Amino acid sequence: MNRKGILFVISGPSGVGKGTLKKALLDQTKDLNLSISATTRPARLGEVHGQHYFFVDQAKFREMIEQDAFLEWAQVYSNLYGTPRGFVLNHLQQGRDVLLEIDIQGALQVKEKMPSGVFIFIYPPNLEELAFRLVSRGQDSQDSIEARLAACENELKHIDYYDYLVVNDKIDRALQKITAIIIAERCKIKNLNMR
């Protein structure tokens, strides 16, 4: 029996473990394809166009914005990043599921354009644990950590836009819950091509 492809969106506050969960899901979940973003930043050593990112120049990216070619896009410092609509739709139309790991603002943009997606909010067990994770990864200044924690409280206000909440207290337990969500969504009648 054929079924429609499903867009699975995981998002949550910075430092909650989205990247770790994404990698584990892709490693262990059959027929789950990663959404590839477009960016104007130069490719780093070892990055491959079409595998890590779609690398485009500013003019091309702006043209794609004008053509409504993105499910979402954002400017991060001097670079632009976006999720190409065509890439995602092509996979979905071929019955392939797509996983998109994104920040909360991006997820809200995607929800507007693709409300049929499955939106999963990843949340820490508490703010103290999130602070510990942010400090432990050693990538952020104290000011940045405090700003991220303040943003986390604000981001919780958007929880109603999501279909599921998964608390990432233990990576294996969170992974098990997301896997259960994927299995259940794949079995829903609305996602099956019955004719």
UniProtKB/Swiss-Prot annotation:
Grouped into one coarse class, the protein's main location is cytoplasm
Give all cystine bridges in this chain.
none
Query: Can you quote a single GO CC term?
Result: cytosol
- Write down the Pfam families for this protein, in alphabetical order: Guanylate_kin
What NCBIfam families is this protein classified in?
Answer: guanyl_kin
Q: What does this protein do?
A: Essential for recycling GMP and indirectly, cGMP.
- UniProt family annotation: Belongs to the guanylate kinase family.
> What name goes with this protein?
Guanylate kinase
